[in-house]
């Protein structure tokens, strides 16, 4: 089944493979994604009228807000970027302008489309790359250069040269056929070959990027570098590495960049997802007032037309933001969603609250997802020939430790598990190459021994866990 035609229930099931709990948030993004598919089936007049319902996620850090949006985008191959609201400044101040988020989205979209197009021509590119490798491994005799152009007219030495090469050419062709066969059978992968590649030289105006020049809606580096001659340098590589470089070069020749650009802009406009994190940090807090609040409100007012739907100039042309899906997120500890300016509140009609993680959630996070942390450590130690196992009681003990440290210090959600597991397995990871055993079982006693004293000492746990 194509990703675009997944039902909301199927989307939630896919997200469940990576994220534990948070059913309401998953349900909201699944409906938003399905609505995009429904909109694509409408006739053109009505299609333009149906706008995406942007989502505001409310919940503490580490509960899955970003991961839900990122996995959703990956699921359907949509261009996705995450930006932090605090990085933007009001127009006229030093810092990034809000339109840069749309430009970044288009860049991501171009990269996605280009990668897909290059994969489509990969077989042809590989054939061309192998031909070039054969020519590099068995170079032909250099063609004789004619110093005097009149020799071409009067059939001098230049005309005689063609016949003298025929026997040598035959030998070269025979040798190349043999080398091509060896290449196809992987017999020359470690042979060294010299290839010419384009040199990536940093230009003097790189520092201008990010200093306000991006507001011109064009990439100055591209404009100026196109006027300068391309420099090539020679590199000596193994055949296996040279093939990758040559495949990339040949694939670039086979794709039409104008077509890539048009498709990328269309993809960004119709399927793009922009995740705006820490939006609560630019809300007017009831406790604080002053110039900082004015600045935050200015950023909100700058974000408003982008979310409402406007046209942003990029180096790939104008991009309409009307149908881009915006997902904003924040913890809202110091502020409330109602502290955002009313116009911006109205542009995020769907609000979902993500729950804090319980001990049971931590247990599930450790073992259930496809990329669960315990599975990652087991795979890492398997490379050293060690089978790592956790008893059920040990997993629960780890979850309890994570929950307790979150309660007594800063609550960083599931990210706490990374710190705790790294501390728990620190000695084992250090000694693994020399330990000389093939199986390790983590028990509750081992967890207590490694982490117990740190957890009990609040000051120590603040620094270590």
Swiss-Prot record:
SMART domains: AAA, ClpB_D2-small. It is found in: Cytoplasm. GO terms for cellular component: HslUV protease complex. Pfam families: AAA, AAA_2, ClpB_D2-small. The keyword Nucleotide-binding applies. GO terms for biological process: protein unfolding; proteolysis involved in protein catabolic process. Keywords: ATP-binding, Chaperone, Cytoplasm, Nucleotide-binding. ATP binds at residues 20, 62-67, 277, 343, 415. GO terms for molecular function: ATP binding; ATP hydrolysis activity; peptidase activity; proteasome-activating activity. A double ring-shaped homohexamer of HslV is capped on each side by a ring-shaped HslU homohexamer. The assembly of the HslU/HslV complex is dependent on binding of ATP. ATPase subunit of a proteasome-like degradation complex; this subunit has chaperone activity. The binding of ATP and its subsequent hydrolysis by HslU are essential for unfolding of protein substrates subsequently hydrolyzed by HslV. HslU recognizes the N-terminal part of its protein substrates and unfolds these before they are guided to HslV for hydrolysis. NCBIfam families: hslU (TIGR00390), PRK05201.1 (NF003544). Belongs to the ClpX chaperone family. HslU subfamily. This is ATP-dependent protease ATPase subunit HslU. The gene is hslU.
């Amino acid at each position: 089944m194509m990703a675009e035609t997944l039902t909301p229930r199927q989307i939630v099931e896919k997200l469940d493979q990576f994220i534990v709990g948070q059913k309401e948030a998953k349900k909201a993004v699944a409906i938003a994604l399905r609505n995009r598919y429904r909109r694509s089936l409408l006739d053109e007049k009505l299609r333009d009228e149906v706008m995406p319902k942007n989502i505001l996620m409310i919940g503490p850090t580490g509960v899955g807000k970003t991961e839900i949006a990122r996995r959703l985008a990956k699921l359907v191959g949509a261009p996705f970027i995450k930006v932090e609201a605090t990085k933007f400044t009001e127009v006229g101040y030093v810092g990034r302008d809000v339109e840069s988020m749309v430009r970044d989205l288009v860049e991501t979209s171009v990269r996605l489309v280009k990668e897909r197009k290059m994969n489509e021509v990969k077989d042809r590119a590989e054939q061309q790359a192998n031909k070039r490798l054969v020519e590099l491994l068995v170079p032909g005799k250099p063609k004789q250069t004619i110093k005097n152009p009149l020799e071409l007219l009067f059939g001098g030495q230049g005309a005689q040269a063609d016949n003298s090469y025929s026997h040598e050419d035959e030998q070269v062709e025979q040798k190349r056929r043999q080398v091509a066969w060896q290449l196809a059978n992987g017999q020359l992968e470690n042979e060294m070959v010299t290839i010419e590649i384009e040199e990536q030289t940093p230009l003097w105006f790189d520092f201008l990027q990010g200093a306000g020049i991006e507001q011109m809606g064009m990439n100055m580096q591209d404009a100026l570098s196109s006027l300068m001659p391309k420099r090539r340098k020679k590199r000596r590589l193994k055949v296996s590495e040279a093939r990758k470089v040559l495949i990339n070069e040949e694939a670039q020749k086979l794709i039409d960049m104008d077509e890539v650009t048009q498709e990328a802009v269309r993809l960004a406009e119709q399927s793009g997802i922009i995740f705006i994190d820490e939006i609560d940090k630019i809300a007017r807090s009831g406790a604080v007032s002053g110039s900082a609040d004015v600045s935050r409100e200015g950023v909100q007012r700058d974000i408003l037309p982008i979310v409402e739907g406007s046209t942003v100039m990029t180096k790939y042309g104008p991009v309409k933001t009307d149908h881009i899906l915006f997902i904003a997120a924040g913890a809202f500890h110091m502020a409330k969603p109602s502290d955002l300016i009313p116009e911006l509140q109205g542009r995020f009609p769907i609000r979902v609250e993500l729950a804090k993680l319980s001990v049971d959630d931590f247990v599930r996070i450790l073992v259930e997802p496809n990329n669960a942390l315990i599975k990652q450590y087991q795979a890492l130690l398997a490379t050293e020939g060690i089978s790592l196992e956790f008893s059920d009681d040990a997993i629960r003990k780890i979850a309890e430790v994570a929950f307790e440290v979150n309660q007594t210090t800063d609550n960083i959600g599931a990210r706490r598990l990374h710190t705790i597991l790294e501390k728990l397995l620190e000695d084992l990871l250090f000694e693994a190459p020399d330990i000389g055993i093939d199986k390790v079982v983590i028990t509750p006693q081992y967890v207590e021994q490694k982490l117990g004293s740190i957890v009990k000492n609040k000051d120590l746990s603040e620094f270590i866990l």
